[in-house]
């Protein structure tokens, strides 16, 4: 296996964030412009500008804050990762829509955002509050989950069962709202499930899966906890449609401290109901801030502290390692990696 660069493009301006999908790379510049590269033709165009004349108490969208860019089939979204603001734009229909979420605990919570296809149309998952995400049909610009409750399925039954054996000291109204902070969103290749890499008070990392069709149609929230850990991992990716790869440090204690390098990080494979299916040990690689993606049965991991690795759960081996290569984005639709270094964007493939 080897990495091969298939295209490069010089960029004018300072790149603040970059994303890729559906054969396009899109990036946010420090002046607020969002540009895109057609990886087939090499054409570069300005997609839209995040600048606006409206004044916000918090300053509005900040092009120089940590941000993320998402691309899917003619749609581009850009959000401040730990802020309130974002935008989604349609390349074909020439519109852009402002996004804004509630400010509660946003400094610790990645802006939930993701695209998927359903019934031939692109849909968007986006956060509105810490425990509330919506799903919209972008073709119709219609929010499909406008009537969805923030209460989980079976909440009343669990409340009654719990207080059969416990004193109800606080006398609060029930059922209570969903007690979960949605985080970074990942979507399965078939669009049937999405994963939230979020957290719950404790604070514990919690990777939770949802069926997209059920989330749209069910008035209550039905969740499946894939993984929970103590300050360990708020990242993961689908490996196929029915499993999730998660970086795990086995010896992290209840306070978020680990035993150093003696016990290495692992990348584990979990079913959507939380059953551990496989694990591969990765000595010498600190995966605390790793990014993960998967295609063709391989899981790719990269980060500034260790470079790049490809893991095959079928053989239980690291099948490729490069300490110098560190992508800035990944096109899951085509299996392309995107680098952004020294004013040049590169498109790479693994062969």
Regions found by a protein language model. Give the residues of each.
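Repeated scaffold domains used in trafficking and secretory/extracellular systems
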Residues: 10-20, 53-73, 104-117, 180-185, ...
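Short beta-strand elements that form the blades of beta-propeller/WD-repeat-like
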Residues: 23-30, 67-81, 86-87, 120-128, ...
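Short, solvent-exposed linear motifs at loop/edge-of-secondary-structure regions
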Residues: 127-129, 163, 169, 173-216, ...
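Long, hydrophobic, well-ordered secondary-structure blocks that form the structural core
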Residues: 110-115, 121-135, 141, 145
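Flexible "stalk/tail and boundary" regions
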Residues: 12-17, 24, 33-38, 76-79, ...
